[in-house]
């Protein structure tokens, strides 16, 4: 009976140790983060051009027959990566703070892209003339598109800062 009790306590304590130690080390976190970013880049790489590049340099989808699929894919991808990363715990508190900031920024980028997407869809699906649509889409890209680009730039800076801290 005594051996069974000691064995049970030992097994329970070993399980508690393994479950309590679910925080990532810096190198494990760096590998995980780079895997998520790599998967996102693969998802958003359409026709050989990165959407990040397209958004950073300006939305280049054309104004006469604009395509919102690229923005939808990037928006969904940002939300997906934020959802996957939100519960990650890291042993280093400074990296944890930066990680939380990164996840929050992904949600902000997702929201900015959703606003851009909705405003572009409203213009595209109206019955106005092509010239009016063109003017409205240019205005949207210079306001809402610019805000989305700034959020993406901030997101990239946080990612670079985390990678510098991990090396």
Enumerate the language-model features and the residues they cover.
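Classical Sec-dependent N-terminal signal peptides that target proteins to the secretory pathway
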Residues: 1-22
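Generic hydrophobic/packing signal
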Residues: 15-18, 80, 105, 116, ...
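C-terminal amphipathic alpha-helix
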Residues: 22-68, 111-167
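Short, solvent-exposed, charged loop/turn and helix-capping segments
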Residues: 72-106, 120-122, 158, 163-166
């Amino acid at each position: 009976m005594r051996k069974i009790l000691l064995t049970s306590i030992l097994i329970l304590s070993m399980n508690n140790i393994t479950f309590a130690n679910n925080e990532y080390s810096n190198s494990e976190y760096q590998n995980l983060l780079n895997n998520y970013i790599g998967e996102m880049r693969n998802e958003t790489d359409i026709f050989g051009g990165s959407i990040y590049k397209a958004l950073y340099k300006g939305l280049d989808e054309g104004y006469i027959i604009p395509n919102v699929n690229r923005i939808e894919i990037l928006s969904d991808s940002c939300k997906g990566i934020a959802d996957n990363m939100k519960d990650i715990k890291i042993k280093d508190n400074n990296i944890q703070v930066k990680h939380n900031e990164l996840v929050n920024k992904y949600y902000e980028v997702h929201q900015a892209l959703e606003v851009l997407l909705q405003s572009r869809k409203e213009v595209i699906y109206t019955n106005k003339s092509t010239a009016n649509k063109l003017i409205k889409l240019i205005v949207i890209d210079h306001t809402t598109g610019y805000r989305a680009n700034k959020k993406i730039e901030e997101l990239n800076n946080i990612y670079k800062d985390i990678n510098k801290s991990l090396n």
